[in-house]
């Protein structure tokens, strides 16, 4: 009997790797995209915002479409495998393109801004194409109940560890090293498991999961109005989170380098390390807090109240960043990113539990 049939820990570890790879690609994007566009290609803060805008637009289309299609197709020996392979290979290629946007621009004849938008859009499309199938395959290959819960717990743990690792690499070795390591990890952690995991030809009843088409009245499922309330609240949270992802580098440049656009190589690398350490602190809090604090607290006061408290604390952190502005020391930034990490820990864990219980 194989590890997959026995549901051994090595199988769970292997099963978590494709989702981890996509999460790592996203972490590389968060740590390095704004920095490299500003420092290497000298794009203005407004143009950096335009490049980042491509991502959410891609996600709005790609995730729902792929989520619906991947339940109903079978090619390349799997239902999820094709999307995991396409997403993983494309994401790794787009990460590799980031340090070579000038060369890509020269080859295609597009301006540097247009090239950056195309690469960022394709990167986000690739991540979104892969994300749902990498999570769906966990449900496909595990029986409902404790085994499936364990599968998602493994995914969250391994993904969280690699998210912290991405920031550590950026802080210690620099963002260029992070990008190149990301290219290799995203490719290997997607491609190898995709060929080692054997998918069932037919989906059982327990594997038909989380499809929005299955919201039927009178069958004990979540009410659509309730879901919309949760989605709306979560959307406002992401206004703050996405703003941080895009513009923290500009905040740090204003606070610690006088807002100068003409930073030298050493100053630019220092700015990149400040950003990586900041996100590393946030990711570390987000990694350890759900199991150690949030889950026990939610059992006492409820999921919604716990999430509300965490988001309120995150808002205080953002408010302090805005209030202190350019007068904030570097250690102050790191401390406030730990405060923001409390909200981040809730954002990446509790909304899904709230939806399940609604």
Specify the residue positions occupied by each region the protein language model found:
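Helical-face signature of the major facilitator-like transporter fold
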Residues: 15-19, 23, 56, 119-124, ...
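Intracellular loop-helix junctions on the cytosolic face of multi-pass helical membrane proteins
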Residues: 1-10, 102, 106-121, 125-247, ...
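C-terminal ends and interior cores of transmembrane alpha-helices
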Residues: 83-110, 312-327
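Helix-to-loop junctions at the C-terminal end of transmembrane segments
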Residues: 61-78, 288-303
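Transmembrane alpha-helices of Major Facilitator/SLC transporters
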Residues: 61-62, 272-297, 317
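C-terminal transmembrane helical hairpin of 12-TM major facilitator-type secondary transporters
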Residues: 305-350
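Loop-to-transmembrane helix entry
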Residues: 43-54, 147-154, 256-287, 331-335
């Amino acid at each position: 009997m194989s590890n997959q049939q026995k549901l051994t820990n090595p199988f769970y570890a292997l099963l978590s790797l494709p989702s981890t790879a996509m999460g790592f690609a996203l972490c590389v994007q968060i740590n390095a995209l704004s920095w490299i566009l500003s420092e290497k290609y000298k794009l203005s803060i407004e143009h950096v915002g335009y490049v980042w805008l491509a991502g959410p637009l891609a996600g709005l289309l790609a995730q729902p479409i792929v989520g619906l299609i991947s339940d109903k197709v079978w090619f390349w020996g799997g239902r999820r495998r094709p999307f995991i392979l396409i997403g993983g290979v494309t994401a790794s290629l787009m990460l590799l393109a980031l340090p070579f946007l000038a060369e890509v621009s020269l080859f295609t004849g597009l301006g540097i801004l247009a090239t950056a938008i195309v690469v960022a859009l394709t990167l986000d499309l690739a991540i979104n194409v892969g994300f749902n199938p990498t999570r769906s395959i966990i449900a496909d290959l595990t029986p409902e109940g404790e085994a499936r819960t364990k599968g998602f717990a493994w995914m969250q743990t391994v993904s969280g560890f690699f998210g912290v690792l991405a920031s550590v690499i950026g802080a210690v070795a620099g963002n260029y090293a992070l990008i190149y390591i990301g290219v290799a990890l995203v490719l290997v952690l997607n491609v190898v498991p995709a060929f080692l995991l054997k998918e069932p030809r037919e989906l059982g009843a327990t594997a038909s999961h989380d499809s929005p088409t299955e919201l039927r009245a009178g069958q004990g499922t979540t009410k659509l109005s309730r879901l919309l309330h949760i989605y709306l609240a979560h959307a406002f949270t992401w206004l703050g989170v996405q703003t941080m992802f895009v513009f923290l580098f500009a905040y740090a440049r204003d606070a610690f380098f006088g807002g100068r656009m003409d930073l030298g190589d050493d100053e630019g690398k220092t700015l990149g390390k400040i950003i990586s350490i900041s996100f590393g602190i946030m990711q570390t809090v987000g990694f350890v807090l759900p199991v150690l604090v949030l889950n026990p607290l939610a059992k006492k006061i409820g999921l919604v109240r716990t999430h509300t408290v965490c988001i309120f604390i995150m808002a205080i952190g953002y408010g302090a960043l805005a209030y202190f502005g350019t007068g904030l020391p570097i250690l102050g930034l790191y401390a406030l990113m730990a405060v923001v990490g409390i909200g981040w820990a809730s954002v990446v864990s509790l909304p899904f539990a709230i939806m399940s219980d609604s």
